[in-house]
Structure formats: C-alpha cells, structure tokens
Amino acid sequence: MRSKAATLRFQVESALAGRLPSPFEYHDRRIVETVSAGIPGIDDLTGGLPRGSLTEICGPPCSGRTSFLISTLASRTAASEVCALVDARDAFDPRSAQTAGVKLDQLVWVRCHNVDQALRATDLLIQGGGFGLIALDLCDAPPRLVRSVPLPVWFRFRRAVEYTPTILLVLDQESNAKSCASLVLRLRTEETWWSQTSDADAAAWPHSPGLLLDGWKSCAERIRSSAKQREPVAPAESRSESTGFEMQTIWNASSDSHTTPGRDVSEGARRKR
C-alpha cells in the first residue's frame, strides 16, 4: 500500500512539474512585503498592502472605493512602479486621476465592457508580470454577475500572483474572493461636507441647488487579514479594526470635480453641513 502511494505521488508530482512547486510539500505562512496605500489611516489599519497577494476592497456606491484606488495608484506610480488598471465598465477618468497625482505614463489602462473581458485581461496581465500593482475595478459591474464568478477563478488569481512583487487589488460592491483574499476591507461613507455657492455662481446657474460638495469622510473596516508581514508600514500596536479617512474635492476653472488622495481624519476636522 505504501509503495503504491509513493508511486502515485511521484506520478502526480511529475505531471505538475513546472506548474506547481512541490504540491505535497508543507509550506509555512510566508512573510510578505507591504507598501503604503497612500492613505495614512489605511496604513495604520492594515500595515500596508501586501505584495504577492490578493487584496479586496468592497463597499456600496459612494463609499470611497474609487478614491482608494486613485490614492493607491498615485502612491505606486510615485514610487516609479508600473501599474495596470482593468476597468470592467470603462468608468475610469484619467483626468481626475492625473489631478490626484497618478502618473499616467506609468499606468496601463485596459478598458473592458463586461466582467468576462475584465477577468481575462487580469489573467493575462498577471501572467505577463512586471507590474507593481494590478487593479481590477468591478465597482460598476452588476453585483449578481460578480457574485457568479466561480471561486476557482479567485483561487487561480491568488496562486498566480503568489511569490511575485505584484499587488492584486480587486474593487467591488461585495466581498467575493472569500478566503482567496489575504486582506479584505469594507468601506462606507460616514459624513459629507457641502458649501454654498457664491451669489455670482447662483446668478450664472439659476437652476443650481446652490450647494457644492467639498468632501466626505469614509470609514474602512478590516474584515480579513491573513498575510504575515515582514516590515509593516505601521506598527502593530497602532492598528485597530477600523479607521476613518477624508477625501477632499478639488474644483477647477471648468467646474469639473476631482478628489485628492485620502488623508487621515486626525489631520484636522472639516465643518459638516
């Protein structure tokens, strides 16, 4: 019986040679490197984003997911890393991202029209390698479609990015990667700040409600964190299970709105209206 088991093991290892490293060998929890997400409060909460792992950011619309994405892209491109964004519903605004500090010449933007295209593009980018961050934006995709993505797909992504310097960042409305994600954060909006327009603006725009969005405060809750970190961005004693961060709107001359990268709410409170 033992000889048959040894023979079977040898056959399986031979068949998987070059595709899976030592499938029957025990692997201890690996120590991963973490990098800043560009938001001090998030770094304090998580210790940073783990490389070679899948990180999932979920939350309802207007909860700060896109702002989190822009902040992370700005942080990674500022560190001279090449990043990739897989945009499942072609919702990315490069002008807003550039205003917030993202270096577009270091960003590969893959514009998709459905979830299946986005998943295939993400798979190709991971296999190609060379990216410091690959972001899969499923925020605007119907939740029922994202929910129907088979769990083996997320497992494949996790295994493909493992032992690489790439951060795989998935953004959606619900947590779908389950145990395949090393870090899961749930975002929600807590407060918003508004300011009244000037008399000149009110005269120019008679049908305007007279209020402009100044910014908002989002809360991030840590749902899952399984990565063992080698050099966390923030010390463990300073971390809790949730944190808040603010996003501030920038209004330019053409009255287009953008958002700045997130900042910790401890930097100063804003007036709530």
Task: Explain the meaning of each model-derived region.
Residues 1-29, 191-273:
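C-terminal regions of RecA-like/P-loop NTPase motor modules
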Residues 60, 71, 79-145:
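Conserved inter-motif catalytic segment of the P-loop NTP-binding fold
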Residues 75, 96, 160:
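Hydrophobic/aromatic ligand-binding patch that stacks against planar heteroaromatic rings
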Residues 1-85, 266-273:
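Detector for small/aliphatic-rich hydrophobic stretches
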Residues 110-193:
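P-loop NTPase motor core
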Residues 34-37, 52, 64-71, 91-92, ...:
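Charged, alpha-helix-enriched surfaces in structured cytosolic catalytic cores
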